[in-house]
């Protein structure tokens, strides 16, 4: 039994697999061309699916992909999509056990589970969000900002809770399952499906390395144009190691650091520390890191949830970082940022950005 999950159910299993060290997500090549799924046995499907996905019903149907109209299931408990678009290799990932075995042995047959690759899932998400916009449930800008969050998660080192992505706890320090370049390459090879333009835009604005939902928020607050709520900062690196200059090594306590955001040519770094650090050990580690940055001539700006929890706090933090960047960019850049932070339209967009990207529960990132 070959099962190709679609849309939100595909995303749910993708997140579950990323969180489970006993599971792998492996590019499936041309499985969507060679395996050709048939309508599944619903009883067997309930048995082999994870518990959080096995309660599908006519009121909450399971989303599945089929690749011909004739192969679609007629069951009201399944939302069967005939995916007739032209898809490249690796448009899907297979969920395997860490030893390489397929999902489940049902005795008389093997159950193989496939999920949409991050690129295809991004297109599906765009379609779903567009329907919400058409129903008046979301504004177009809110839909765009929500769309931007997924490629940053897939290309980053965190994953949201599959059962409750808005309120559930994230898991951190994971391997990414995509890069923006791979997502864009897949989207460029797809044809015959809606949602490609906005999916391509979202992938083009994303970058690898985000370590938490709050870092994703800050990344876009830094990089987006002012009419979208950002401060149009110069390009930066995310979570890439800094190797200290040899002459500075006698003065630092860490041989290497990995700032969340780093502008190498501007001698500026920004770090998101999760919840407020209240323990003595965490406070001392914060101080050591700041001293190391200062010893090497880098202005570092640590942030916690209180710096992003509302528009006033976020504006204040962005102004501080912009002030440091202006030493290289010039006073005109800082004036432009201050105008954007005071402008009603830009502030409104930043408020929408916060509403779609700020997690309801602060991320509890691991200590250094």
Language model regions located:
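Short gly/ser-rich loop at a beta-strand->alpha-helix junction or flexible surface loop bordering the NTP-binding
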Residues: 1-194, 332-333, 341-368
């Amino acid at each position: 039994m070959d099962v190709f999950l679609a849309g939100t159910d595909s995303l749910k299993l993708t997140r579950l697999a990323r969180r489970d060290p006993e599971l792998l997500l492996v590019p499936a090549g041309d499985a969507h061309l060679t395996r050709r799924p048939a309508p599944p046995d619903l009883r067997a499907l309930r048995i082999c699916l994870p518990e959080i996905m096995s309660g599908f019903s006519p009121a909450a149907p399971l989303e599945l992909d089929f690749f011909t109209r004739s192969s679609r299931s007629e069951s009201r408990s399944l939302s069967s999509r005939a995916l007739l678009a032209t898809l490249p290799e690796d448009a899907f990932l297979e969920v395997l056990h860490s030893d390489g075995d397929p999902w489940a042995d049902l005795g008389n047959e093997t159950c193989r589970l496939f999920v949409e690759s991050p690129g295809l899932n991004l297109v599906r998400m765009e379609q779903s969000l567009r329907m919400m916009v058409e129903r008046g449930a979301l504004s177009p800008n809110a839909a765009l900002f929500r769309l931007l969050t997924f490629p940053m998660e897939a290309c980053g080192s965190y994953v949201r809770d599959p059962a409750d992505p808005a309120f559930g706890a994230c898991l951190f320090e994971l391997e990414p399952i995509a890069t923006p370049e791979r997502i864009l390459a897949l989207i460029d090879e797809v044809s015959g499906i809606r949602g490609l333009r906005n999916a391509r835009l979202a992938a083009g604005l994303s970058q690898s390395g985000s370590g938490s939902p709050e870092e994703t928020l800050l990344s876009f607050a830094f990089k987006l144009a002012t009419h979208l709520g950002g401060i149009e900062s110069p390009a930066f690196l995310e979570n890439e190691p800094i190797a200290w200059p040899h002459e500075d090594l006698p003065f630092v306590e860490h041989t290497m650091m990995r700032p969340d955001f780093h502008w190498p040519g501007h001698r500026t770094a920004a770090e998101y520390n999760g919840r407020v650090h209240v323990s003595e050990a965490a406070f001392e580690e914060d101080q050591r890191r700041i001293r190391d940055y200062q010893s090497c001539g880098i202005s570092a700006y640590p942030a916690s949830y209180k710096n992003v929890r509302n528009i006033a706090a976020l504006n204040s933090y962005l102004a501080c970082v912009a002030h440091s960047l202006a030493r290289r960019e010039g006073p005109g850049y800082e004036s432009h940022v201050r105008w954007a932070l005071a402008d009603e339209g830009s502030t409104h967009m930043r408020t929408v950005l916060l509403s779609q990207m700020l997690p309801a529960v602060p991320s509890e990132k691991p200590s250094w």
